[in-house]
Amino acid sequence: MDIDADKLYWIYKKLFTIRFFEERIKKIAVEKSVPGYLHTCIGSEAICVGVMSALDSDDWISSTYRNHGHSIAKNCELKEITSEIYGRRTGICKGRGGSMHISDFDKGMLGSFGIVAAGPPVVLGAALQEKINGGTKMSATFIGDGAIHNGAFHEAAGLAKLWDVPMLFVCENNAYAEATATDWHLNTKELKDISKAYDMISYQGDGNNVFEVSQITRDAIIESKAKSTPIFLEFKNYRFSGQYEGDTQLYQPCLLYTSPSPRDS
């Protein structure tokens, strides 16, 4: 894919910033100097940055409780994100949301949700209003592999196809739904096959390859807008941290835990 120098610099800067930020947050979590749970996205940076590099800056997105990377890639202010994690009034949500609930409507960040699969219905609403009002903004909702078992996801997917709205369901398949391996909770060979139930177009890609993520997302956006239809994207990757900071990860086989390192973005 052709990427100009400015975009390449933006991609590198965002990848580096997210990793540095999360490693620092991880250290802070060990020191127990912030309230509440912290969920880092170390290992998922390529998905955050790749998808956001394909979206316009004012497009709509929603995130999950593992939202720091999405927020940074969406150009939310680092100082405001950090203040929010500390519960300060200067935080992006005035300190009321904490780590799991980052939002900034001015940047197109409709919200990060501590409840699994709470984002798809919200982004569906954004996509529907764009269609009704003749808008051109794209709408994308980030979910994890565990979210596909939640009713809210299926309701949003069904209505998105019924109403033919252009939006993206971006699934970060990081091999574990909390402590449950994908092979133990998924009854299809490939996670993206879930979309067949809704006659939805789907793509699959390497979540550790930022350029592949970006290209697949660009192609999906073009197709989604041209056909006025939702599209399901599955990006396979691996989270190097636990489900939350403090998770001992005893449920993970050593082979799985160490093998992704050479593919680390």
Predicted region positions:
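Structural signature of the thiamine diphosphate
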Residues: 211-248
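Flexible loop/turn segments at secondary-structure boundaries
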Residues: 69-71, 148-149, 176-179, 211-212, ...
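A glycine-rich helix N-cap at a beta->alpha junction
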Residues: 165-169
